[in-house]
Amino acid sequence: MSSNASSEVDITETNKLTRVYSEEEKRAILQEFIDWASYRAEIGGMVVSDHYLGHGASGSGDWYANTENGEMQVQDIGQGIPGYDQFPIHLLGGVVFYTSIEELYGYDPRPGIESIAVGFHRLANPNMPVTRYLLGDDGIIYELKGTLTELGSFHGGYGLYEEDGSKAIDSSSDIFEVSKDTDAQERYMEILSKYN
């Protein structure tokens, strides 16, 4: 989901908004963003889901994403492996854009009820890209785009720390880049400004 807008979002040190957000604030921020993203998806002939991570039984380590600005803690398991303070960026929420195999546009709640093993494979058009947006507590949206084969699982693009603090052998080496979607970046900054 890239914008055709000619303006550029200034992603600099002044955009670093890092603070600890409550779970209630995270839900509110994500809801505002998903409301905006649903409309964007609908006019673009796509769907969007807020089911950005799903996994079965895993170790007691944290889930993370590699970004061009360092590792982002995607899910804090609460065991301190490696723990909140070890990550420079923390997730406030995330969305996944894809093209449905059905005539469905806008928000899609179905990924949240699909089985972990199925992922997006029964929902997404295999010939179209899947794009994940991660909303960082640094005020930046990070993006990873790939094929259904690459990102079709609910944990595609992420890594996991093992109980001993090492990275799981099947952790993704994908890098989430700073999104060039200027409309999304600007909307995210507007939303965050209400909480900072």
Question: What label would you give each PLM region?
Answer:
Residues S3-N196:
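Mature, Sec-exported extracytoplasmic domains of Gram-positive
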